[in-house]
Amino acid sequence: MAKTLYDKLWDDHVVHTEEDGTTVLYIDRQLLHEVTSPQAFEGLKLANRPVWRISANLAVSDHNVPTTDRSHGIADPVSKLQVDTLDANCDSFGITQFKMTDKRQGIVHVIGPEQGATLPGMTVVCGDSHTSTHGAFGALAHGIGTSEVEHVLATQTLLAKKSKNMLVKVEGTLPRGCTAKDIVLAIIGKIGTAGGTGYAMEFGGSAIRALSMEGRMTVCNMAIEAGARAGMVGVDDITLEYIKGRPFAPQGVEWEQAVAYWRSLHSDEGARFDHVVELRAEEIRPQVSWGTSPEMVVSIEDRVPDPDKEKDPVKRNAMERALEYMALQPNVAIGDIRIDKVFIGSCTNSRIEDMRAAAWVVQKLGKRIASNVKLAMVVPGSGLVKEQAEREGLDKIFKAAGFEWREPGCSMCLAMNADRLEPGERCASTSNRNFEGRQGAGGRTHLVSPAMAAAAALEGHFVDVRKLG
């Protein structure tokens, strides 16, 4: 019987299934960070339980760490407590951790794949909604709650119910200047933030297969923003080439054995999906979100939508509220929207490919950040990404143009550290969420690709990067 990739991954990890469909699922890898793990570790201590499989866990601090000078530690007492608590818990339980001073430290969804800790065929969980990122490797990956983090630490299993299968098929060739970020924003714009609810979402088609692993991670990262439980891409040579030789990846004979299995991790010909969504890559344009939800997105060629043209009263009210919060008027050209700050980073777009794309735009335009842009910052996803970018001279390109070159961390993706928007400030951001207050109380977020963000920083407003050549 032909199986989908999701079916294969699920079936390979079922320990037991109850009559109501509740399944005990084996977990191969748990990633931990400082925000959702303290209560889980405390629960283990109170119950006097050990970590069941220490080697299956990998930890890093990312949400609360400063991205400026770290020589004086963390100034904010709450952030410091969370980071110190993770350090102490990992030391106590013997869990491998990349501490703040380790060059391997970075955003959890960047360092996992970077280290080869995320592998095809795995079940991967983390107390973070964007764990779907790891599905790019032909893995079943999704976020879990704090009580579930404790459950996995104690048992290496998770209670779950199976999702339905969805295929998002993107065929054709992307126009020059368009990226994986534009693909996934276009998908969310098409199906909405509830379009994937109840589904595990597989991304396929020639445009997806043409993406690098960095691009595939960007797409899977935002599957959760379409409402899906997980996002995934089948394994191919691009997957294997990325993994080979990484620290946690198998070596020698074990590598050959693993590859033999990994090559089966794709949906079979004729596999049945409960729902299929199709897009043509050549129809995708550089995307810019205008509202307070990732589904509120249009292309750089468009104008801010007019609520009066929306027949659904619920959607119309949501649009009106979003426009009020974003301080935008209907029918304004997207290219006329001026910005105050630029953030290039996050678990969506902080890998070396993203750094290169942004630096290329900066070089192409050959100017400094616009006078109306108060701050433009580039935050690499890990210390290793930062090192690689510096070897290539990308940091010099950014700094010469007036960008700040920062230390790795979640940074301005969310207002949980020193990097945030002030009320009323408008930001071109390569992150994944544009909710009210996401980047700071009263802050206004526009989601874009790294290239679009870099161009906006230099021009002071959104521009069409396709016109750069």
Swiss-Prot record:
Task performed by this protein: Catalyzes the isomerization between 2-isopropylmalate and 3-isopropylmalate, via the formation of 2-isopropylmaleate.
Any one biological process term the GO annotation gives: L-leucine biosynthetic process
Reactions catalysed, as given in the entry: (2R,3S)-3-isopropylmalate = (2S)-2-isopropylmalate
Keyword Metal-binding listed: yes
Organism: Ralstonia nicotianae (strain ATCC BAA-1114 / GMI1000) (Ralstonia solanacearum)
Keywords on record: 4Fe-4S, Amino-acid biosynthesis, Branched-chain amino acid biosynthesis, Iron, Iron-sulfur, Leucine biosynthesis, Lyase, Metal-binding
Enzyme class: lyase
Official protein name in the record: 3-isopropylmalate dehydratase large subunit
Catalytic activity, EC: 4.2.1.33
Family according to the record: Belongs to the aconitase/IPM isomerase family. LeuC type 1 subfamily.
Residue positions binding [4Fe-4S] cluster: C347, C410, C413
Short name of one Pfam family: Aconitase
A single MF term (Gene Ontology): 4 iron, 4 sulfur cluster binding
Co-factor binding details: Binds 1 [4Fe-4S] cluster per subunit.
Pathway(s) this gene product operates in, as recorded in its UniProt entry: Amino-acid biosynthesis; L-leucine biosynthesis; L-leucine from 3-methyl-2-oxobutanoate: step 2/4
CDD domains assigned to the protein according to its UniProt record, in alphabetical order: IPMI (cd01583)
Subunit structure: Heterodimer of LeuC and LeuD.
Cofactor: [4Fe-4S] cluster
Superkingdom to which the source organism belongs: Bacteria
